[in-house]
């Protein structure tokens, strides 16, 4: 598997935003159409204890969503569905050429699986792409309240604005260094202060 730097993943997602004139909360299914990808629902068995939410069939230019988990995928205006489709667009953008050239093997025949919680590097790349696509850094920065801020309501409001679930929003904010959680697991603006750092420069 080829290593893809996170900044490259962010840049590829930003290119899609620019090329397709996307806005916050955009219609992921319309984006699939514009990318020339189809979408179907079909029953897919979970694998090895992992919940399979979706698949990409790159040779058929087709995204498959698992109808066995339709209730979960469609909760809260389909937020997990949006994230799963973003994940499959990530596979298409990052991995489809390598698959077609034979330099990247598929996980199962001619399908790439989207397993919930998978730590496979290829899956992690697609996960990072989905986060960058649905919560682009520049748009998220402009939506943040000025620091300092504290509490879950800020994270919930941003999740509602970007049509994603709260957990991926919190992870995205933490990864960008715009939020950390205190000892009570409460979101707080900014990066966490390293233990003892407060005492380095006493007032």
Give a label for each model feature.
Residues 1-203:
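Active-site hotspot residues in diverse enzymes, especially metal/ion-binding acidic/histidine motifs
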């Amino acid at each position: 598997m080829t290593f893809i730097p996170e900044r490259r993943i962010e840049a590829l997602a930003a290119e899609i935003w620019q090329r397709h004139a996307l806005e916050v909360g955009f219609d992921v299914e319309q984006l699939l159409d514009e990318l020339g990808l189809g979408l179907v629902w079909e029953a897919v068995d979970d694998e090895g204890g992992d919940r399979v939410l979706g698949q990409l069939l790159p040779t058929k230019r087709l995204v498959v969503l698992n109808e066995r988990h339709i209730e979960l995928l469609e909760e809260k205006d389909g937020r997990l569905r949006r994230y799963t489709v973003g994940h499959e667009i990530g596979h298409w953008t990052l991995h489809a050429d390598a698959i077609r050239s034979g330099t990247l093997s598929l996980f199962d025949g001619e399908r790439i699986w989207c397993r919930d919680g998978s730590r496979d590097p290829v899956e992690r790349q697609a996960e990072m792409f989905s986060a960058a696509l649905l919560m682009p850094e520049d748009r998220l920065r402009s939506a943040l309240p000025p620091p300092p801020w504290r509490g879950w309501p800020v994270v919930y409001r941003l999740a509602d604005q970007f049509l994603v679930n709260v957990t991926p929003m919190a992870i995205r904010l933490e990864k960008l260094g715009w939020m950390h959680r205190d000892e009570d697991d409460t979101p707080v603006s900014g990066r966490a202060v390293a233990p003892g750092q407060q005492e380095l420069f006493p007032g």
